[in-house]
């Protein structure tokens, strides 16, 4: 026969101790409802003592204490000597005291890590066993810890109960809110002992530490590139498979992972909360503001050891350094030019092949990269909705406007000519100073730009990498090939 305890919610003493007042209200309502159903069916032979307490409708914490007393009759309250907190279970008092003293009596036999209670040790052991007992019914994703599943389920419901008082942004977990708050406070509690660099989140700190160890155990079978994390390898492998599953609804641009899509979508929103105090320019991300501020300070802290070239950020330096490394760079088989990433090499190779796989259905114009196509399509609408606040000039897209705005930002003090980036401005300023730092080892001729030197060196090698498909004539420069192709058209 069905009894009350067959349908009751059976909490362990530890679980009961952790319930909040509103959770106890829910617990009480469900327990009483279950009992009323049994009573209606004539299956409740006698009223359990716990139900009697719950029917008194006392405050949830009174119910909690009395319910615990009902389940464990005759047990006295166990009180912490140093603090006023009391526990019905002695095991909970012991666990509480270990937290205060820092004692960690439960040790993992696999790796030696110690914990102050058995449940934390059990959760930790699942790292070694790979066990993930808590599964999401919505998407099938599994978790080691029940609380992680609860946080994950908010992704499906859209619930974000934790709100930042500073900017109003909401989060699905308290830990994410705590990490976000550090943007406002500037707090960086995780410091690298190796180089002294500090981080606001534990995950970025751990990721950084792998730079010092140099360990990259996850290798791409396609191009032999190595990664510190399996997730990074997985994202990278989509480059080879051309799989871009995550598409922006605003402009149609596809991405390899949801994180990149989310980051991209901020561009479409008008919100730019991070403003430069020096010039008033606003940014979507704090990292972009920090990098921009180095322009005003004239700082380029990240210097290349191989060629003395300096950069505003370590990301730009790392990308540049691949050019010097034969192992990590991507070499063009046609002209020998090296690139820091595989997509850059692919894009470059289309100059040799003349391939333009992305076609506009409206006018038939073709493009070598997919990113140009959505912006081109805006020109057919005839609308120029984006206005430059500096000069009033109108543009079809935010991309065109941003490209134009850089001309106002990077201006030559000598002739007031504008440039799209700092590197182009620096190269131009050498026209006024007469500086030519790039010298040809073959003939001693010097150049103001590195790309001019690279093109000049083809004269010595006799190499003409740019070939006309119509007549077979070869050229040193892509610009010369384009000019020549006008003869055939």
Swiss-Prot record:
GO terms for cellular component: nucleus. One of its GO terms (biological process) is regulation of DNA-templated transcription. InterPro entries: KRAB (IPR001909), KRAB_dom_sf (IPR036051), Znf_C2H2_sf (IPR036236), Znf_C2H2_type (IPR013087). A zinc finger (C2H2-type) spans 78-100, 106-128, 134-156, 162-184, 190-212, 218-240, 246-268, 274-296, 302-324, 330-352, 358-380, 386-408, 410-432, 438-460, 466-488. Its main location: nucleus. The keyword Zinc applies. Belongs to the krueppel C2H2-type zinc-finger protein family. May have a role during differentiation processes. This is Zinc finger protein 58. It comes from Mus musculus (Mouse).
């Amino acid at each position: 026969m069905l009894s009350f305890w067959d349908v009751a919610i059976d909490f362990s003493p530890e679980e009961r101790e952790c319930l909040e007042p509103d959770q106890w209200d829910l617990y009480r309502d469900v327990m009483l409802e279950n009992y009323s159903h049994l009573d209606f069916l004539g299956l409740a032979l006698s009223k359990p003592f716990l139900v009697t307490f719950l029917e008194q409708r006392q405050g949830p914490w009174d119910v909690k204490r009395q319910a615990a007393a009902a389940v464990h009759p005759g047990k006295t309250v166990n009180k912490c000597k140093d603090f006023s907190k009391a526990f019905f279970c002695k095991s909970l008092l012991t666990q509480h005291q270990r937290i205060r003293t820092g004692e960690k009596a439960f040790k993992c036999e696999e790796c030696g890590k110690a914990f102050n209670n058995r449940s934390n040790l059990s959760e930790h052991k699942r790292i070694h066993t790979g066990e993930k007992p808590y599964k999401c019914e919505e998407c099938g994703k599994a978790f080691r810890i029940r609380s992680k599943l609860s946080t994950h389920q908010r992704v499906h419901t859209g619930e974000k109960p934790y709100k930042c008082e500073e900017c109003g942004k909401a989060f699905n977990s308290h830990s994410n809110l705590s990490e976000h708050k550090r943007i406002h406070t500037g707090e960086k509690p995780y410091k690298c002992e190796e180089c002294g660099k500090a981080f606001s989140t534990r995950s970025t700190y751990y990721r950084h530490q792998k730079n010092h160890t140099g360990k990259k155990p996850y290798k791409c079978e396609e191009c032999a590139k190595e990664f510190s994390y399996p997730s990074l390898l997985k994202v990278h492998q989509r480059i080879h498979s051309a799989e871009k599953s995550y598409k922006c609804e605003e402009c149609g641009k596809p991405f390899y992972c949801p994180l990149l899509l989310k980051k991209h979508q901020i561009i479409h929103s008008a919100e730019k909360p991070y403003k430069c105090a020096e010039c008033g320019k606003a940014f979507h991300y704090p990292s972009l503001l920090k990098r921009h501020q180095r322009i005003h300070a004239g700082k380029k802290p990240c210097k290349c050891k191989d060629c003395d070239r300096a950069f505003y950020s370590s990301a730009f330096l790392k990308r540049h350094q691949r050019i010097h490394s034969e192992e990590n760079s991507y070499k063009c088989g046609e002209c020998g030019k090296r690139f820091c990433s595989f997509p850059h090499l692919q894009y470059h190779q289309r100059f040799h092949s003349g391939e333009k796989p992305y076609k506009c259905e409206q006018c038939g114009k073709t493009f070598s990269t997919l990113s140009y196509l959505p912006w081109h399509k805006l020109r057919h609408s005839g609308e120029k909705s984006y206005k430059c606040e500096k000069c009033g000039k109108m543009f079809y897209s935010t991309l065109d406007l941003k490209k134009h705005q850089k001309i106002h930002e990077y201006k030559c003090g000598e002739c007031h000519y504008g440039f799209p980036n700092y590197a182009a401005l620096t190269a131009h300023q050498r026209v006024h100073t007469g500086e030519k730092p790039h010298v040809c080892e073959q003939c001693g001729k010097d150049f103001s730009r590195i790309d001019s030197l690279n093109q000049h060196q083809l004269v010595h090698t006799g190499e003409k990498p740019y070939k006309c498909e119509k007549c077979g004539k070869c050229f040193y420069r892509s610009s010369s090939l384009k000019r020549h192709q006008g003869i055939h058209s």
